[in-house]
C-alpha cells in the first residue's frame, strides 16, 4: 500500500473499530487501523486478529495496522472515529493538526459529550472547524456479528451529500451489510445515545424478574422518550422508527451481547454500580449517557421519566426495584400525550 491511497483510516482498535475495519477491508478496500496503545497494535499485527474481542475472525490482507497517528492519518482522506464518547473530543483535538487538507470525518461513536450533553456534531465543529465534511453511522450492530459477516444494516447521515454517497459505496456490501442514507443528522446521532440508557433500564427490568411484558413496555415507552427529545432538538420523528432508533433500541434491550443490558441486569439483581462496571470489564456507554441525556432533556424542558429513574439508580443510590415501582405508580394518562 502506498502512503496515501487507503480508502479509510479507522481511529480506535477496540471491538467495534476492529469489526468496521474488517468489514471495509473485506469489501476490497485498503484500510488502516490505528490504536493508542503501540503494544496492542503490535499484538494485532502479530496475531492478524483481535484475540481479545474477535478471536475467530482473521484480518483480511488489505487491513493494515498502524501505531503512529501521523502515518495513519496521512494514509487516507476518510477518517472513521470509533472511540468511547467520553474521549471523543480529546481524540479530535489530537488528530486535527495531523489531518490531510482534504480530510473528511465520520464517527461510529454513540453518545453525547461527557458532562455537557452536547451532540457530537457540535463537538466536532468546535474541534475541527466548519469546513470539514462530517458524517455519522449508527444502528443495530454488535461487533462480533458484523466482523463475522452476518447480515447487518445501519443508518448513515452526513452534512455533505457527496461524502454520504462515497461512504455508502465504501461500506455497503450486498451480501451482508446494508447502509441506508438518512438526511436527519441530529436524529441519527441522538438515537444511539438514548438507546444506551433505555437498554440499562431493560436490563434492570429483566434482572428484577419482571418478564417480557414489562421489558416490551419499557422499550416502547423508551422509544417515546427518544422521539420526544428528538422533536425538541429538531430531529425528524421518522428517524426513530429506523435503524438508528427502533432498530438499535430493540437490539440492545433484548440481547445479552449488549454491555448496557448486562450492566442493568446486574443492578436489577442487586449488585452495586461499581461492582457491575467491574464485572463487565469494558466501557458501559450508557452509564455516562444517562447523565448526559438527562442534562439534555432538562435543558430543553423534555420530560423523560424512564431516563430520570435510571439516573436515580446510577447516580443517587436508588434501588432498581424502587425505581421501577415509581414508574408504575405514575399518574394515569393518555398513551400519546406529550408528557
From Swiss-Prot:
It is found in: Cytoplasm. It catalyses: sn-glycerol 3-phosphate + NAD(+) = dihydroxyacetone phosphate + NADH + H(+); sn-glycerol 3-phosphate + NADP(+) = dihydroxyacetone phosphate + NADPH + H(+). Sn-glycerol 3-phosphate binds at residues 110, 139, 141, 195, 248, 258-260. One of its GO terms (cellular component) is cytosol. InterPro entries: 6-PGluconate_DH-like_C_sf, 6PGD_dom2, G3P_DH_NAD-dep, G3P_DH_NAD-dep_C, G3P_DH_NAD-dep_N, NAD(P)-bd_dom_sf. Its EC number is 1.1.1.94. Pathway: Membrane lipid metabolism; glycerophospholipid metabolism. It comes from the Bacteria. It is an enzyme of class 1 (oxidoreductase). GO terms for molecular function: glycerol-3-phosphate dehydrogenase [NAD(P)+] activity; NAD binding. The active site is at residue 195. One of its GO terms (biological process) is glycerol-3-phosphate metabolic process. Pfam families: NAD_Gly3P_dh_C, NAD_Gly3P_dh_N. Keywords: Cytoplasm, Lipid biosynthesis, Lipid metabolism, NAD, NADP, Nucleotide-binding, Oxidoreductase, Phospholipid biosynthesis, Phospholipid metabolism. NADPH binds at residues 15-16, 36, 110, 143, 259, 283, 285. NCBIfam families: PRK00094.1-1, PRK00094.1-2, PRK00094.1-4. Belongs to the NAD-dependent glycerol-3-phosphate dehydrogenase family. PANTHER family: GLYCEROL-3-PHOSPHATE DEHYDROGENASE, GLYCEROL-3-PHOSPHATE DEHYDROGENASE [NAD(+)] 2, CHLOROPLASTIC. Catalyzes the reduction of the glycolytic intermediate dihydroxyacetone phosphate (DHAP) to sn-glycerol 3-phosphate (G3P), the key precursor for phospholipid synthesis. This is Glycerol-3-phosphate dehydrogenase [NAD(P)+]. The lineage of its organism: Bacteria, Pseudomonadati, Pseudomonadota, Gammaproteobacteria, Enterobacterales.
